[in-house]
From Swiss-Prot:
A single Gene Ontology CC term: vacuole
Tissue/organ expression: Accumulates specifically in tuberous roots and tubers upon tuberization. Sporamin accounts 60 to 80% of the total soluble protein of the organ.
Name of the protein: Sporamin B
Tree of life domain: Eukaryota
InterPro entries xrefs: Kunitz_inhibitor_STI-like_sf, Prot_inh_Kunz-lg
Any one GO molecular-function label of the UniProt entry: endopeptidase inhibitor activity
Name of one Pfam family that matches: Kunitz_legume
PROSITE patterns: SOYBEAN_KUNITZ
Annotated keywords: Signal, Storage protein, Vacuole
UniProt-annotated location(s): Vacuole
Signal peptide: 1-21
Role of this protein: Major tuberous root protein.
CDD domains: beta-trefoil_STI_SPOR (cd23368)
Length: 216
């Protein structure tokens, strides 16, 4: 029954919006500026997501939705550090471990609608060890605002929030909020025809996901 309910909720996010056929980030009004909810973000087991620990962020849509998030270098001709955040094509691929750290240094669990830093926790060479924090960068060629990994300062990397899609199903989305404003935008999927990869980018339609412990 839960699976059917989740499919129904997710279908609402997949309906086309003809008024936004061109990229136009949606302005969101955050429900809470601070953690006023008593329920933390929960993983697929129903356990609290702990601050500073590693998790997989995996598409909640089985099938065409893809798997988990990975840090890759889409430009094979470049020697730069991997910086592209993609959704794995395989449902069975959980992706790379991601550390979620609240902006509040006293927080022990991750609360919805509060600022977080996302960083990949993967082995890299010494030159790329700090190029793992999430941020947003504009791509002039495609016109997209992509989620990228790099040496973002804290003010730029902790502008993400986890928002509840359905609190009974432990399904969530991510919003990105412009620093110093209340304007927030959905983080969704963008299919890049040049690289044939599905990338995370600001979008009208959110990327709906579940959170898996890395020890599963």
């Amino acid at each position: 029954m839960k699976a059917l309910a989740l499919l129904f909720v997710l279908s609402l996010y997949l309906l086309p919006n003809p008024a936004h056929s061109k990229f136009n980030p949606i302005r969101l009004r955050p429900a809470h500026e601070t953690a006023s909810s008593e329920t933390p973000v929960l993983d697929i087991n129903g356990d609290e997501v702990r601050a500073g620990e590693n998790y997989y962020i995996v598409s909640a849509i089985w099938g065409a939705g893809g798997g988990g998030l990975r840090l890759v270098r889409l430009d094979s001709s470049s020697n730069e550090c991997a910086s592209d955040v993609i959704v794995s094509r395989s449902d069975f691929d959980n992706g790379d471990p991601i550390t979620i750290t609240p902006a509040d240094p006293e927080a022990t669990v991750v609360m919805p609608s509060t600022y977080q830093t996302f960083r990949f926790n993967i082995a890299t060479n010494k030159l790329c060890v700090n190029n793992v924090n999430w941020g947003i960068k504009h791509d002039s060629e495609s016109g997209q605002y992509f989620v990228k990994a790099g040496e973002f300062v804290s003010d730029n990397s902790n502008q993400f929030k986890i928002e509840v899609v359905n609190d009974n199903l432990n399904a969530y989305k991510i919003s990105y909020c412009q620093f110093g404003t209340e304007k927030c935008f959905n983080v969704g999927r963008y299919y890049d025809p040049l690289t044939r990869a599905t990338r995370l980018a600001l979008s009208n339609t959110p990327f709906v996901f579940v959170i898996k412990p890395t020890d599963m």
